[in-house]
Amino acid sequence: MASNLVKFHSSFQFKLNTTSSLSFLGSKQQLNNLYHSIFFTKPKSDFSPLQCSLSSPTPPITKEDAVSQAKFSLSTTLEKPLNNPKLIGKIKKLKQPRFRVEIPVVDDSPSALAQLAFDIFGEMPIKRKAPNIKILLLWPNQTLTQAAQAEFEKKKSSNPIIENLDISSRIEISADVVVFMAPEASILTVMKEISDTLYPMPVVIFNPKWGFDEESSFGELSGFVGSFEVVYSFMGLEVRGILSNRKGVMFKCVKDGVLSGEKWYVFVEEDGELKVVSRFKARPSIVEVENVLYNLMAVNSPITKSAKFLKDLVSNVRGKK
């Protein structure tokens, strides 16, 4: 397989081993204009986050669109467990609601991540019979925690109640939902301990710092990480061809809080619009995505088309079909 065929545009600092033919782009220069110019040369004006509810999901055009979609997917997914806490507690073996959200960002500075946290959770439209949902955001270090506290104090959120804490804080956690913000692999053990303590209340991983293909190397913690169901994920990619490059995206967006049956979609730009080229029931590995895009580029390459034309020409001359 050709090397460096595909490049992923990501904010999550995904890392790959040296044997992989994919490389993730992480700098501000590489991620510049991620949402607009990379994905659409013909922007659509009728975008709505509710398009996650349609049979054919629509990837976001701008960062604001991605935030709106992610907020809609997560809030509707959280509504069921938050509105039925007594039912959850009565069933001992019921699975703890664990969700995961991934939104690429150009700027991963403390102030930018704090702004993103407010955009997602500050005005999250969760429908609940009881008022004042409390969401606890756990940050991996004190710097991020302080930035988030300053952001939420500056922009008062009406609902829900938000609290920002350092994950290393030795205090009793009390909340309706706990979110691990931009966690690193080094704190997975602590995350598992907290999640087990909070059972059966919902927990969320938001923008993990590790890559999906790294998770198989987490040992006993691989199962813990894998127990978080992705409700929203959006990753840009670039397909490198012989004569030109093509742009696309890997995308998942849960519809109306229904997790079962939601697929992962791979889109590639064609004639200024993104079109679905593959669907996966489970999250595809880097190699699987590369295979799909490699085959697509091979089929559409001038060399392949010329070879097919010559083969058809010879068949016609010989009277064969």
What residues fall within each predicted segment?
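N-terminal chloroplast transit peptides
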Residues: M1-P57
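Short acidic/glycine-rich loop or secondary-structure boundary segments that cap or lie
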Residues: I187-T189, F212-E215
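A conserved mid-domain beta-alpha-beta active-site/ligand-binding segment of alpha/beta enzyme cores
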Residues: E214-V299
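Short beta-alpha junction loops
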Residues: W139-L144, N207-D213
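Long C-terminal extensions of eukaryotic subunits of large macromolecular complexes
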Residues: L5-S27, S278, V289-K321
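Positively charged, amphipathic N-terminal segments that serve as targeting/anchoring signals
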Residues: K42-V190, T197-Y199, S306-K321
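A structural signal for leucine-rich repeat
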Residues: I194-D196, E220
